[in-house]
Amino acid sequence: MAIGRYGTLVFYILAGLAFVWSLEYFKHYTKNNYERFHCTAVVEPVQGTATVEKLSAVGGPPCDKRAELKLITQKLTQHFDPNKQPALFCIVENTSVESVHYPVSRTNKGPAGYIAYAGYEADRAAVHKYCEAHGAAVLHM
């Protein structure tokens, strides 16, 4: 009789631990794959430069300006390693887009709320040119 009670106790403890593990795994997965649930990153190389990229984010209804900014900063830190060489970037706000905006259709997600230009020190002049054209300050990383 005692073995059955202890077996039941062990079963419920393991079931509880499995539930907690699955919850933590889900939180970790959604944190690392934020763009899959909210926005989609759009990374376009800038013509005539070696490392400069134009980054933006578009998506469905949960992709508001806050989510776009979060995804752009996440992509900046993933794509540009300041340990290789210093990186420069600027983030330009599209003021014609509301903070909470919705896609035009399933295929047309509408304009991006933020656009970033980023590159390494080797393309310093190109980054400055694109950022100054939009009146944005160049930041160093």
UniProtKB/Swiss-Prot annotation:
GO CC annotation: acyl-CoA ceramide synthase complex; endoplasmic reticulum membrane
Which residues are on the Cytoplasmic side of the membrane? 1-3
Q: Which residues are glycosylated?
A: 94
The species this protein belongs to is Eremothecium gossypii (strain ATCC 10895 / CBS 109.51 / FGSC 9923 / NRRL Y-1056)
Q: What is the lineage of its organism?
A: Eukaryota, Fungi, Dikarya, Ascomycota, Saccharomycotina
Where found, per UniProt? Endoplasmic reticulum membrane
Name of the protein described by the UniProt record:
Ceramide synthase subunit LIP1
Q: Biological process (GO) annotations?
A: ceramide biosynthetic process
In the record, the note on similarity to other proteins reads: Belongs to the LIP1 family.
